[in-house]
Amino acid sequence: MPNLLEKTRKITSILQRSVDSLDAELPYNTMAAQLADIIDCNACIINGGGNLLGYAMKYKTNTDRVEEFFETKQFPDYYVKSASRVYDTEANLSVDNDLSIFPVETKENFQDGITTIAPIYGGGMRLGTFIIWRNDKEFSDDDLILVEIASTVVGIQLLNLQTENLEENIRKQTAVTMAINTLSYSEMKAVAAILGELDGLEGRLTASVIADRIGITRSVIVNALRKLESAGIIESRSLGMKGTYLKVINEGIFDKLKEYN
């Protein structure tokens, strides 16, 4: 059976792995599963707004309401507010505690249910909450040491990912600004007309039809599309006589066009 040191190493090794994107449906599912396996419990990670970032049900809890939290990916406001007022780990909470993840109506079924809640911090900010629970076994001191380490690791990962996402957003905004600045007035007019033709972020268009409608030459549209594609704003593919397939990669172009209109 792994000892405390081995379990600690397993948790810290999570830092060597990456989370793809906070935009993913449940970006921390894998991490929650790893932590649940190491600590031997059920686990979930929520952000400051109560949105579920990931969870793992190693042991069946058999409560419809808890499972509904996971299906909707959102915890109740009253629970999130209570959890946000936990500044240090609250360990081995009974089913009678307001912070117990076991609903009131299931107390009789899980009289020995235990919940532990740990705040997640990163960069001096409260980023979320790490919640673990068992149906019938208290968390030992060794378990609680692992919980402290786990919440720190999650905080570092969450902060790093937020930083990466921020840098990516800045890069995209810069690319859009630079692309827009290379467009002539006619090309800007063409881009606005082209994007207005799309059904959401992608679609098929015919350059000559758009050119005739807004009173510019087809070459202006072609040049505008080339500039946007070289800047990584769009992807395009010729469909021959059917026109051109267009897909917007950098959605910031829509907001930037509004500024110029």
UniProtKB/Swiss-Prot annotation:
Residues 1-159 are annotated as: GAF domain. One of its GO terms (molecular function) is DNA binding. The keyword Hydrolase does not apply. It comes from the Bacteria. InterPro entries: ArsR-like_HTH, CodY, GAF-like_dom_sf, GTP_trans_reg_CodY_C, Transc_reg_CodY_N, WH-like_DNA-bd_sf, WH_DNA-bd_sf. SUPFAM superfamilies: Winged helix' DNA-binding domain (SSF46785). NCBIfam families: codY_Gpos, PRK04158.1. This is Global transcriptional regulator CodY. It comes from Streptococcus agalactiae serotype V (strain ATCC BAA-611 / 2603 V/R). The gene is codY.
